[in-house]
Amino acid sequence: MTALSRLAATVEARKGADPESSWTAKLFAKGPEKCAEKFGEEAVEAIIAAVKNDRANLVYEAADVLYHLTVMLAARDVSLDEVLAELDRRAGTSGIAEKAARG
């Protein structure tokens, strides 16, 4: 099991937890919109770290992005496996061809 798979399993397990006992459960209790907002905030922080060429902070913020992406997906009942299957589907297809196929 990869670190990302373990993270997804832990996040999923927190869905029904007491919001006072878990940060993840607290995010779920605030609703999917708040989960999406937190993902956006963390993405911006990662972008800033990248623009500033702050490697250590970029690694830190990228981990936050992955965590909050996982929470946001779970809040909308989208599994990590679904996202990975989409990546597998796209494998071997150029980005240009994939974008053109979307219209």
Swiss-Prot record:
Q: Name one GO molecular function term.
A: ATP binding
Biological process GO terms, please?
L-histidine biosynthetic process
Q: What class of enzyme is it?
A: hydrolase
Provide GO CC annotations from the record.
cytoplasm
Question: Which HAMAP family would you find in this protein's record?
Answer: HisE
Family to which this protein belongs:
Belongs to the PRA-PH family.
The entry's protein name is Phosphoribosyl-ATP pyrophosphatase
Ranked from the top, the taxonomy reads: Bacteria, Pseudomonadati, Pseudomonadota, Alphaproteobacteria, Rhodobacterales
